[in-house]
Amino acid sequence: MENNNSNDNIITKCNRCSISCNQKPLIENLRKSDIMFLGISAKIKEKEDEMPLSENTNSGKLIKMIEERLLEENNNLLCYRSNMVKCVPLNEKGKIRYPDNLEIENCIENLVYELNIVKPKVVVFLGRLVEKHLKKKIMELGYNTITIYHPSYIYVYRKKEIEKYVEESSKNISKYV
C-alpha cells in the first residue's frame, strides 16, 4: 500500500493563489483508501497536526459517525478526508468565507495529485457546492462519486435527523465499497 506521510509534496508547497499565505494547506497523510470524503475548504487549524474534517468540528463528528457505521459492516475499510480547497479562504476581517472560483480552480491540480495516491473506490462530495465544482472532473478521471448533505447543514438545520442522515449516508456509500 502506498503511503506518503511526507510533507514534501505539491500540496504543502502550493502557492498558486493568495490564500496559501493564510496557513499551511490542511491535508491528511496521503494513503490509499476506499472512501474519500471531500469537503469545501480547510478551516483555521487549532493544532499543528490537525487534519481535514477534524473530529473537533461538528462536521468532523458526523463524518466519524458515518465512518463508524461503515466499519460495522466492513472493518477493513480505509477512509480519507480532504477538502476541495486545501487552504483557508479568509475575508478581510479574518473570518472564513466560501472559496471563490479561481481558488477552486487553482486547487484542482492538488486534488488530482491526492486522487492519484488515494485511489478511492468512491469520492463522497459533502454538499452541492463541492459536487457542482468537481463532479464532472472527478468522473472524467474514472472515479465513482456520491453526494450527501454537508454535515454542517445537518448539524445546524436538521439536528433531529442526525441518526437518519448517518444511516442513509452510510447505506448509500456502502454500495460502492
Regions found by a protein language model. Give the residues of each.
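A polyanion-binding, active-site-adjacent surface
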Residues: E2-V156, E163-N172
